[in-house]
A protein has these predicted regions:
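Sec-dependent signal peptide cleavage junction
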Residues: 19-29
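Short, well-ordered beta-strand elements
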Residues: 29-40, 92-95, 114-117, 144-146, ...
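N-terminal lobe/hinge region of extracytoplasmic solute-binding protein
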Residues: 35-88, 180
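Gly/Pro-rich hinge or "lid" segments in bacterial periplasmic/extracellular proteins
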Residues: 54, 76, 159-209, 213, ...
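Aromatic- and charge-enriched surface segment that lines or borders ligand/interaction sites
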Residues: 83-125, 274-276
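Surface-exposed binding/hinge segments that line
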Residues: 86, 90, 94, 128-170
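Ligand-site clamp/hinge motif
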Residues: 202-247
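Periplasmic-binding protein-like
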Residues: 271, 275-302
Length: 302
């Protein structure tokens, strides 16, 4: 029987909660090898430390970290580590955490742990500090109270950004960017631009973890990624070039995809003597064939 491979077109969050069709490499151990073109220093994902540039995407994608809140498939905010929030006034937010949340090292993820993580975040991550505008954080058991320096109606949305993964600050961050989170996997080895090794979190608070070990291989070249999947060197691929898709449109492979909120856009120079004219900008916009962009440049995957 041929092993069916998984081709990840969109964010591969399915990894974190277990892939039931993952092939077992040993009778008593389920392992999974994942090829990714985006997990690299050039893409500002040099490690899995969410407080380092855009590495929060890798932290959350590979199941190491989780945020207080997250976006649903319909882009609605829903609880994750937190169970509810209250906007007390325009500067004050009270967040209540779920009971029983623990880090992978066994430490309880309570209000104090969240306070420490968020304080470290705004100290080390310029974009997060600018988004959140936190003035103070207080912790009382499983309740965290955040006061902002200015009204932040989108605070909960910002806390859902991957940079908001809650990590155990007391456990520290290794020299190669490994952190302790609350997710279903624990990172045991990381070499930037080469690989990440993950094992199941035996202390996971939110259900069973179905895969024992995951290896994420950084394969920055799309053609090389396609060859690796064809050769059976990896079980799934993320970030493959659209031109390679026809190679996998058969019964041996499955495409997994989801809609994204990501938007691609171009700026127009309002100070230019040409594009400062609204009529010119409108004409340029009308002349852009969006349908052809999707059907030709993206081969319909857009």
């Amino acid at each position: 029987m041929k092993t069916k491979k998984i081709l990840g077109i969109a964010l591969a969050v399915c990894m974190t909660m277990g892939l039931t069709t993952v092939p077992a490499m040993a009778e008593d151990k389920k392992t999974f090898v994942f090829g990714d073109t985006t997990f690299n220093a050039e893409n500002e994902e040099a490690d899995i430390n969410p407080q380092n540039t855009y590495a929060g995407w890798a932290c959350i994608r590979y199941g190491v970290g989780e945020t207080l809140f997250r976006y649903s498939d319909t882009m609605e905010i829903e609880p994750w580590i937190a169970k509810e929030y209250e906007n007390v006034d325009e500067l004050t937010w009270k967040i209540t955490l779920n009971d029983g949340v623990v880090f992978s090292n066994g430490r309880v993820c309570d209000g104090q742990a969240v306070k420490e993580s968020l304080e470290s975040l705004v100290e080390n991550h310029e974009r997060a500090a600018g988004d959140l505008c936190i003035d103070s954080i207080e912790a009382d058991g499983n309740v965290v109270t955040i006061k902002t320096t200015e009204p932040k109606p989108a605070l909960i949305n910002y806390l859902s950004d991957p940079y908001g993964c809650i990590i155990d600050v007391q456990a520290g961050i290794t020299d190669n960017g490994i952190v302790i989170g609350t997710g279903p996997y624990v990172a045991t080895d990381l070499v930037t631009d080469d690989h990440l090794t993950l094992v199941k979190n035996e202390n996971y608070w939110n259900g069973d973890v179905n895969v024992d070990e995951i290896t994420v291989r950084t394969i920055s070249d799309g053609d090389t990624l396609a060859f690796a999947l064809q050769a059976g060197e990896i079980n799934a691929a993320y970030g493959m070039a659209y031109a390679s898709y026809p190679l996998f449109e058969n019964d041996d492979f499955t495409f997994s995809s989801a809609a994204t909120s990501r938007a691609f856009y171009a700026w127009m120079n309002f100070e230019s003597t040409v594009t400062s004219d609204p009529a010119v900008r409108k004409a340029i916009a009308m002349g852009i064939d969006k349908e052809s962009f999707v059907s030709v440049l993206l081969n319909g995957y857009g």
